């Protein structure tokens, strides 16, 4: 995840990504929809040639970088994440890898000194300012013909729906007491998801239809190779190629 920039700082509703970081992986490990996203990404990597350079934008606690580093140990990988707690979690998790660099700059501040062959951006774009410009930045960071793996939460977050879904799964997996314990440990996630919903409603965070994000991606200089709704229908996944 990537936090908001100062452009939105005058608005009162925005997620506290540092608070989110503390419990993010706990709940993600028990969320089948999130695990399905990771499996999709792993499957995608199995279909491409080894990238020389990989950038992950808004890499959060490093789950996608972890998969990329395992799949491509010879690639140079840079994880960009402005939030201090998120990137600390990522550094701890990924400490065994020698091919990962960490950068706290926001996307709009990243130069293209070393263009990538693959850019990963998962559940981050919607929380950035000026998404059309940020999509152009993603294109700027890619070599011509390079690939963008983009997943974006563009549809309104129904927190009650997610709570029901996760609790039902956890109850089957861990029993009632176990489910309640995990929910209590991950209560900050529920709080921040409620804030995300409010930020979507007030326009601080970007919402879009599948057609709208496809149009924005195309305008930014990409050909869309694949698009589908994922994450219980709340997110759009697009695999794109940078136009020459």
List each model region and its residues:
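Conserved class I S-adenosyl-L-methionine
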Residues: 1-49, 63, 67, 86, 149-180
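Core SAM-dependent methyltransferase catalytic element
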Residues: 220-222, 226-244
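A short glycine-rich, Lys/Arg-flanked "PGG" loop and its adjoining helix->strand segment in the class I
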Residues: 132-144
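A short acidic, Gly/Pro-enriched loop at the edge of an enzyme's catalytic core
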Residues: 110-119
């Amino acid at each position: 995840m990537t936090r908001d920039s100062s452009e939105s700082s005058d608005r009162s509703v925005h997620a506290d990504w540092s608070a989110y970081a503390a419990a993010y992986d706990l709940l993600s490990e028990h969320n089948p929809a999130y695990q399905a996203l990771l499996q999709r990404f792993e499957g995608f990597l199995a279909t491409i040639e080894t990238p020389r350079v990989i950038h992950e934008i808004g890499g959060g606690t490093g789950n996608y970088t972890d998969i990329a580093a395992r799949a491509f140990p010879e690639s140079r990988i840079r994880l960009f994440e402005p939030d201090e707690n998120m990137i600390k979690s990522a550094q701890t998790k990924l400490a065994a890898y020698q091919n990962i660099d960490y950068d706290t700059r926001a996307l709009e501040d990243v130069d293209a000194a070393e263009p990538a062959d693959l850019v990963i951006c998962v559940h981050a774009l919607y929380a950035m300012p000026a998404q059309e410009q940020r999509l152009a930045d993603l294109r700027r960071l890619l070599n011509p013909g390079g690939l963008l793996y983009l997943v974006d939460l563009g549809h309104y977050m129904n927190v009650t729906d997610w709570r029901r879904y996760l609790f039902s799964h956890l109850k089957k997996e861990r029993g009632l007491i176990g489910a309640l314990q995990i929910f209590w440990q991950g209560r900050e996630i529920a709080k921040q998801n409620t804030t995300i919903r409010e930020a979507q409603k007030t326009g601080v965070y970007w919402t879009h239809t599948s057609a709208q994000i496809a149009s924005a991606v195309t305008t930014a200089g990409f050909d869309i190779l694949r698009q589908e709704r994922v994450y219980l229908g709340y997110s759009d996944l697009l695999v794109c190629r940078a136009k020459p």
